[in-house]
Regions:
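Enzyme catalytic cores with a strong preference for nitrogen-chemistry domains
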Residues: 2-270
Length: 270
């Protein structure tokens, strides 16, 4: 992450509510220091690599449920649209085009809520592990993952280019920053810049973090520490299910700036 990294800012106007509800999507009301409530829905979903019809159907169902609960914002995991890890499917032009076509179709149906969805962005010949910001039927923003893991089971640098610009958006006057998976594991990564320079109230991290023994506790401790360090609410969503040798355990979290866990998703269950 270079010193010249820019932060893109967007303002979205939404009506906020404070009704307590719960369903297939986990819903949490976050009250910021400005005493404004934001209702956030978290979709801890089981994406299937390459099955765009299945993934789109799961996302659309969660959007309908979040709308029923009058959520302001809904989060989907890293590469929720394509499944993770797509690996050499990323080398197929048809796969990339289906991913982009599915995103456009998905965006057209997003109304009355802000949605963040993981997908693959393409710029000329370069691919980016990205998160799309969907609002009022359009893709209104895009964040490209800045820190790409290339160790153990991860081989992202083979397929993706690194992003160089952070993004913040505002809902009901609440500033929200966006990161993807590995971005949050680096204490001095993009999350720090978003929270210190853009003064984000909430930092979002969409993830595809595989399970191994002790990983849930390590991840939870890290997220709580980042919330304390950045002095921001941290909302984290993770995939569930399995793909090849990888198993994803979910364990999504909402954490207050003091490191207190507000709500926690189930393990190994949507």
């Amino acid at each position: 992450m270079g010193k010249g990294m820019k932060i893109e800012k967007k303002t979205l106007s939404m009506k906020s509510v404070a009704k307590k509800t719960r369903g297939k999507v986990r819903v949490s009301d976050i009250k910021t220091s400005s005493q404004v409530n934001l209702r956030v829905a978290i979709s801890q979903m089981n994406s299937i690599v390459g099955d765009f019809k299945h993934n789109l159907n799961r996302i659309e169902n969660c959007l309908k449920e979040a709308a029923r609960f009058e959520a302001d914002l809904i989060l989907f995991p890293e590469l929720a649209l394509t499944g993770y890890p797509p690996e050499d499917l990323l080398l197929k032009e048809d796969f990339i085009e289906k991913n982009l076509k599915t995103l456009k179709h998905l965006a057209s149906g997003v109304t009355g809520i802000v949605a963040i969805v993981g997908y693959v962005a393409k710029v000329k010949t370069n691919l980016y592990n990205s998160a799309a910001l969907l609002y009022k039927g359009k893709v209104v923003g895009n964040y490209r993952k800045m820190i790409l893991p290339n160790y153990g089971v991860f081989d992202e640098k083979r397929y993706f280019m690194e992003g160089h610009e952070s993004i913040c958006f505002s809902v009901n006057g609440i500033t929200i920053g966006l990161t993807i998976c590995e971005d949050i594991w680096d204490a001095n990564g993009p999350g720090k810049k978003i929270c210190t320079e853009a003064q984000a109230d909430i930092l979002v991290n969409i993830s595809a973090s595989p399970y191994f023994k002790g990983r849930g506790k390590t991840r939870e401790d890290m997220i709580r520490e980042r919330a304390r360090k950045y002095k921001a609410h941290l909302v984290y969503t993770n995939l569930v299910g399995g793909q090849d040798e990888l198993v994803f355990d979910g364990h999504s979290l909402v954490v207050d700036p003091d490191g207190t866990i507000v709500t926690k998703g189930n393990s190994f269950k949507e």
